[in-house]
Amino acid sequence: MEKIQRYLQLERSQQHDFLYPLIFQEYIYAFADDRTFSRXXSILSGNPDSENLGSRKKYSLLIVKRLITRMYQQNHFLISSNDSNQNKNPFWGRNKDFYSQILAEGFAFIVEIPFSLQLLSSLGGKKKRVVNSQNLRSIHSIFPFLEDNFSHLHFVLDILIPHPVHVEILIQTLRYRVKDVSSLHLLRFLLNEYCNCNSIITTKKAGSSFSKRNQRLFLFLYNSHVCEYESVFGFLRNQSFHLRSASSGALLERIYFYGKVERLVNAFDKVKDYQVNLWLVKEPSMHYVRYQRKSILASKGTSHFMNKWKCYLITFWQWHFALWFHPRRISRNQLANYFLEFVGYLSNIRTNPTVVRSQSLQNXFLINNAIKKFETLVPIIPLISSLAKAKFCNVLGHPTSKPVWADLSDSNIIYRFVHICRNLSHYYSGSSKKKSLYRIKYILRLSCARTLARKHKSTVRVFLKTLGSGLLEEFLISEEDVLCWTFPKTSSALRGVYKSRIWYLDIICINDLANLK
């Protein structure tokens, strides 16, 4: 980001008001194509694995120059996408999908510049310290917070964050942060070209096509919407409930990435004794956590208190965002009797009774203690369904071969299975009970063996007898390497590793099989 800031040589104030002229600069598309600034595969890079409508064109300045020339010649953006002759729009020509996606990638990169510059300026002297703590850039950083705080809470609201139904809702939300009117008109044009309808997220076909073609722009729009939705908690913290003031900023996931290090979890702790005009305000402690499309709001208050919060959130969404939100998308549950589906885990708070024998002089007595423990379990049924969908097993969990990979080399087949097994193993390494995780590993190992046996036209038993323990070692080595990296100095920490929970804080993204949503 600093390199871009020096290259553009623009003041922060100008970044907010004059973003649109940058869309005509060639270097913007070069920056957008750079993988350093984009995690998703770009259509400009010609990645063979990306779905780009069959067009695997390499990045070329000539293509960008043609696009810029077309934008300079006429203002074709005035043509409505709802026009019956939209397919004959002379601006796109024959390469409508390709040109529109290039323009969308460039726009997504440009519109992130003000937010990124604001983040760098807010970090200031803390920048180096934040960057050095790269191991904390993980969704697993949320579990220590849950273990320390959720054990004494009573009720939780499990919330599915509502999506905007209309394109104009996204545009209006972004108007509070981007003041360049021309850029907003360009965004409206791109959304209409992508979807040709008023709904870009709720419609399955349109939303799926939009998110797959340009994930970066989709994430930016969605995070802007969520940021506006979460602003209500900051208002309530400072106004209604007299919550303790804490420094917090508008965090956009995957855009304000390093900001998640210090403010990954927004915990709003109540001030226990707050005296105003000789009357005492005592409110239950509230904790708010968000991950992707879900968020949870937990409290140690009563059931009636949580119902009031539920009604308030529904009313807020309907009046502020002008969208209908079904009450069933918010479920109120008691933590002691409810499994919370969060971050791919099934979490629950259980009471474990313990008996302690004490002796004072000649008298011995027993003390019964009830300790609340935060447990995280592997969702075995959704995982097996994901493996069955990927053709690694059937719906009952019996391993099958992968015929599509049978034409690959042996090393490539083993690498692919090990890679998936390693990602799933690392992601669910924090589970309290690892029996379900061992079953997933067994399915992948046997599926790998059956795929290799199918390739060599042999049986699994004969193939494993010929190969020996080599296949098993491939799966185990991947785990040992990570364990050594996690504990580089204390080898004794490896003892009892399968009995305790280990959080792999170096995980940023996981395999699609581990993403149950």
UniProtKB/Swiss-Prot annotation:
Keyword terms of this UniProt record: Chloroplast, mRNA processing, Plastid, RNA-binding, tRNA processing
Subcellular location, record wording: Plastid, Chloroplast
GO MF terms held by the record: RNA binding
GO-annotated cellular components: chloroplast
Annotated coiled-coil segments of the chain: none
One Pfam family hit: Intron_maturas2
Top-level taxon: Eukaryota
Any one GO BP annotation for this protein: RNA splicing
Signal peptide start-end: none
Family designation: Belongs to the intron maturase 2 family. MatK subfamily.
Described purpose of this protein according to its UniProt entry: Usually encoded in the trnK tRNA gene intron. Probably assists in splicing its own and other chloroplast group II introns.
Listed name of the protein: Maturase K
Source species: Veronica arvensis (Wall speedwell)
